[in-house]
């Protein structure tokens, strides 16, 4: 039995979970999210208000999807109650970010500003010209947008310049030494 998959998912008050076959829809104070569970995995509501994720057999695919499915359902519930936020920072002379309406505009040492549009369900907040955050209810979307922004100018291992997650440690390399 999967150590993660066998733990029941608690549903807090104010969250409505509806299950229709393999489709799970979660509605909460911050919005609504839907997920389709892969075929061998079954999900059911318990009498005590929790959700249980079960697998029919011990095949390799079923074991692999058991814990994953439970975690994805838990992420939906956490997203509609608390939401997800990724804080990021920019290091480098002249590197900065500005909020233009709902979108972000980066100055990252290129000959042009780099705009990033806010997709549906994602909000940006700029705390200072070098610190900003990406927020939303979908954990996967928040993480993907954050990774795309970081990819605009990855942190340099020699000087540490670039876009990074808050608190991220960059492995620094020693430069060449002259003779």
Swiss-Prot record:
Record's keyword terms, sorted: Ribonucleoprotein, Ribosomal protein, RNA-binding, rRNA-binding
Keyword rRNA-binding: yes
One GO BP annotation of this record: cytoplasmic translation
PANTHER family (UniProt xref): 60S/50S RIBOSOMAL PROTEIN L6/L9, LARGE RIBOSOMAL SUBUNIT PROTEIN UL6M
Family: Belongs to the universal ribosomal protein uL6 family.
Subunit structure: Part of the 50S ribosomal subunit.
HAMAP family, per database record: Ribosomal_uL6_B (MF_01365_B)
Annotated protein name in UniProt: Large ribosomal subunit protein uL6
Source species of the chain: Rhodococcus jostii (strain RHA1)
